[in-house]
Design a protein with these regions (language model features):
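Alpha-helical recognition/docking segments in bacterial nutrient-uptake
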Residues: 1, 5, 59-173, 177, ...
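N-terminal helix-turn-helix DNA-binding module of bacterial transcription factors
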Residues: 1-62, 75, 339
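Hinge/beta->alpha junction and helix N-cap segments in small-molecule ligand-binding domains
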Residues: 69-78, 96-105, 150, 160-170, ...
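Short helix-capping segments at alpha-helix termini
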Residues: 89-90, 141, 206-213, 239-242, ...
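Periplasmic-binding protein-like
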Residues: 118-125, 184-186, 219, 240-250, ...
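Short acidic capping loops at alpha-helix termini that bridge into adjacent secondary structure
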Residues: 182, 213-217, 268-273
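Flexible loop/turn connectors
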Residues: 234-235, 239-342
C-alpha cells in the first residue's frame, strides 16, 4: 500500500507542507487547532514519518544535484558554469548528471540523488519527460528543488526561465522585418514546454502581421541534431513551396540547414533567410554567420543556484518558503543569415 505523504495532508487541509511538518513536531508557532487537525488526519491516513526528511533537515551534505539533458550542449554548459561558480562561493559541491534526453534515465538519476541525500536538486527536464511522478517524489521528501529551461509548469517549485513565446515571436518578427513573407518553422519535439512555447510564438508573429498560418510549413523534429537540419533543408527545397524564411528551434538544427544550403548553392539570406535560437558558439563560425536568439545561460545557472540556496536556508531553519519564478531577458542577434537588402 502506498504511503501517505506530507503534501497530501497539506493539500487536504489547505495548508503548506512546512506547516504540516511543524505541526507534527509540535512547533510553538503553529496553533493548537491546526496541530489537532494535522494530527487527526495523519492518524486517519496512517501517515508514517519520513525519517529521511528528518535526517536531511538535521544534517547538511553541502552537496547539490544537477540533472541536465546534455553536458556538451553550449547552452547547458553555460548553465553548469554559472551553478558551479555560485555553489563554490557558498561552499557547495555539485553532482552533475546527464539524462541524455531519456525519461527513464532521468528517473534513475532523481532516485540516486535522493539516496545520496543531497541538500537540493536543480533540473532541466529531458525531452521525453511527459509525467512528473519522479519530480513529485522530490517534493514529497521535502528536498529543495529548482527547475530551469525545460520545466513542468504545474509543479509547485521555483523556476528560472525565459519567455520562449516572446523570444520566438521576436525572432519571427525579425524575419518579417527583413522582408520574409512565407516563413517555415522547424519546431522542437512534442513534449518540452519550451518547444511548445516557441511554436506558439511563431504563430503569434504571423497573426500579428496578418500572415495566414499554414501547418504544412511546420516541420517537427524527431531529434535535435545537425542531421535533422540537413534533412529538413532537403525537404524544404524538394517541396519548393516558395519559403523565404525559416525559424529553427535551436542553433544546432539551424546549422544543419545552412550546411545543406551551402552545399547545393542556395544563397542565404538572398534566397532563404534562417534564424536559430540559443546563440551557440557555432552560430558565429559558420558561413554565413547565423542570426539567433541570445539565451543567458550563465546567468540562468547563477539564478537557479541562488533560488535553491534561498530554499535550502529556509528548509534548514524551518521557515516558510514560497516558490517563485525568475524570468531572464532575451535578445535577437542579427547576423548574415538574415540581414538582406529588402
Amino acid at each position: 500500500m502506498r504511503e501517505t505523504t506530507l503534501k497530501e495532508i497539506a493539500d487536504i487541509l489547505g495548508i503548506s507542507v512546512t506547516t504540516v511538518s511543524k505541526a507534527l513536531k509540535n512547533y510553538p508557532d503553529v496553533s493548537e487547532k491546526t496541530k489537532k487537525a494535522v494530527i487527526d488526519l495523519a492518524e486517519k491516513l496512517h501517515y508514517i514519518p519520513n525519517s529521511f526528511a528528518v535526517n536531511l533537515r538535521t544534517k547538511e551534505s553541502k552537496t547539490i544535484g544537477l540533472i541536465i539533458p546534455e553536458v556538451v550542449h553550449h547552452f547547458f554548459s553555460g548553465v553548469v558554469n554559472g551553478i558551479i561558480d555560485e555553489a563554490e562561493k557558498n561552499g557547495y559541491l555539485v553532482i552533475i548528471l546527464q539524462s541524455n534526453e531519456s525519461l527513464e534515465l532521468e528517473k534513475k538519476q532523481v532516485a540516486l540523488l535522493i539516496n545520496k541525500r543531497v541538500d537540493g536538486i536543480i533540473m532541466s527536464l529531458s525531452n521525453e519527460s511527459n509525467n512528473d511522478v519522479h519530480i513529485k517524489d522530490i517534493l514529497d521528501k521535502e528536498i529543495p528543488f529548482v527547475q530551469f529551461d525545460k520545466i513542468a509548469k504545474l509543479i509547485p517549485s521555483s523556476k528560472v526561465i525565459i519567455n520562449d513565446r516572446k523570444a520566438a515571436q521576436e525572432a519571427v518578427q525579425h524575419l518579417i522585418d527583413m522582408g520574409c513573407k512565407k516563413i517555415a518553422h522547424i519546431r522542437g519535439l512534442e513534449n518540452p514546454q519550451n518547444s511548445i512555447d516557441r511554436f506558439m510564438g511563431y504563430k503569434m508573429a504571423l497573426e500579428k502581421n496578418g500572415i495566414p498560418f499554414d501547418p504544412s510549413l511546420v516541420y517537427p523534429c524527431k531529434a535535435i541534431t545537425f542531421e535533422q537540419g540537413v534533412e529538413f533543408a532537403k525537404q524544404i527545397l524538394d517541396e519548393d513551396k516558395g519559403i523565404d524564411g525559416i525559424f529553427v528551434i535551436t542553433d544546432l538544427v539551424a546549422v544543419g540547414v545552412l550546411a545543406h544550403f551551402n552545399e547545393v548553392g542556395v544563397k542565404v539570406p538572398e534566397d532563404i533567410s534562417v534564424i536559430g535560437f540559443s546563440n551557440w558558439l557555432v552560430s558565429q563560425v559558420i558561413t554565413p554567420k547565423l542570426s539567433t536568439v541570445e539565451q543567458p545561460s550563465y546567468e540562468m545557472g547563477v539564478a537557479a543556484f541562488d533560488l535553491l540556496l534561498e530554499e535550502m536556508i529556509c528548509h534548514k531553519e524551518q521557515k516558510e518558503f514560497v516558490p517563485r519564478t525568475v524570468e531572464l531577458g532575451t535578445a535577437v542577434i542579427a547576423r548574415e543569415s538574415t540581414l538582406r537588402n529588402k
